[in-house]
């Protein structure tokens, strides 16, 4: 993806030092919170993140599940 937003992502210590999360899930958390700060919620799709990090949607879903299982995020799925 050519366009990268110019904002800071802050990852709280509780997330950074959680040994149940892999490093990429922690990085994704920072991206999620940065996007949520922009509009009050994270509007991006799984495909958006897959393109951003050059991984599959399945990988993004795995990272999101890690974050949800540890209660760092709550997901609502919207279908078009």
Regions found by a protein language model. Give the residues of each.
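Short recognition helix of helix-turn-helix/winged-helix DNA-binding domains
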Residues: 1-59, 65-72
């Amino acid at each position: 993806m050519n366009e990268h937003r110019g904002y800071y992502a802050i990852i709280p210590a509780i997330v950074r030092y959680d040994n149940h999360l892999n490093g990429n899930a922690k990085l994704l958390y920072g991206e999620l919170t940065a996007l949520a700060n922009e509009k009050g919620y994270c509007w991006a799709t799984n495909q958006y993140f897959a393109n951003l990090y050059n991984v599959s949607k399945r990988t993004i879903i795995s990272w999101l599940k890690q974050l949800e299982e540890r209660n760092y995020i709550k997901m609502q799925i919207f279908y078009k």
